[in-house]
Amino acid sequence: MARSSGSSGGISVDRFSVVLVAVAATLWASDAYFRNQLITHLTPTQIVVAEDGLITLFLLPVLIRSVHELRNLGWKGWLAVVIIAAGAQSLATILFTASFQQAATYKVFAETFVLQQTQPLIAIVLAWIVLGERRRPWFWPAVVVAMVGVYLVVFAQDPTAPVSALQQGRVEVGLLALGAALLWASGTVLGRFALGSISFWSMTSLRFTLALPLLVTIVVVQYGTGAFSHYQFSDFVPNLLAIALVPGLLALLLYYRALSRTPASLATIAEMAYPVAATFIASAPPPWGFNQPIYGVQLVGTALLIGVIVLLNLTKERVAEVSATSTLKLAES
């Protein structure tokens, strides 16, 4: 059994580890610039499979060198890694894209985005069930402040949009968005679980390597023998290469390095930097963004989220020394 995260057990959260999770989440949003130049002739799945293939190629030497380390993963650890690869890396993106496309058809975009904001709540519940994480009472008001901050950023133009969208919402749009949120949230918790037995390098390598066969299969099923005929050399240099290196490889290495020393319930709050960063990137002029206006309330919301992330980073929380081969239980921090 893992040691208690009380005063005498566990590992102290690294300085700036929560902030580093937020930085990684911000890097995820940077793919918008490069992705915008690909979506005219490639589908989201085709973009994801090419990105995954490049990163797998980059990390193959790392995976080969760390084969001995993979023996530390018990069946629970392997199950966690497979769920991350198949769910968070593969199916979640497909579900979210499908939800967005359905929302576009019925003009209920806000339904997709507001239900996506359930992800941190799902992750906190899963961290409690899977890892046994317990947070102090002050944590919950901080969560509320962070979610209010993100809400102000995402729905600045019309704060009532989620209410009307949900009232006129479509069941299929909501289920797809919730499915993506569940898979991404489980990726955070199970990633923290697996990192108890393997390094962040190995975790990153396994995530992309195990996801690649599934993604290739999905693309072939969707588009048949011509699934890979739409790629051009100009797609790979610089766009797909940049997506693979920055929001892909660099962001995930940084994310798993920070997650290895951060409770999952704290990391999921820091991940909320992603929709905030994506919103501000969208405000950039073309071709970098969509020239969307910036509202004063968005600056307020951003300040609230940054304040919560800094607060979480300054706390004296401790992370239990977990192992993917053991029963996990975290005492109250």
Where are these regions (language model features)?
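Glycine-/small-residue-enriched transmembrane alpha-helix faces in small-molecule transporters
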Residues: 1-49, 98, 161-196, 279-281, ...
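Transmembrane alpha-helices of multi-pass small-molecule transport proteins
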Residues: 2, 16, 41-91, 120-127, ...
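C-terminal-most transmembrane helix of multi-pass membrane proteins
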Residues: 2-7, 138, 236, 272-333
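Juxtamembrane helix-entry segments on the extracytoplasmic side of multipass membrane proteins
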Residues: 13-17, 41-45, 49, 73-79, ...
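Helix-helix packing/entry segments at the starts of transmembrane helices
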Residues: 25-26, 47-50, 109-118, 190-213, ...
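Specific transmembrane alpha-helical segments of multi-pass solute transporters/efflux pumps
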Residues: 30-31, 67-110, 152, 244-262
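Hydrophobic/aromatic residues within transmembrane alpha-helices
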Residues: 38, 47, 51, 99, ...
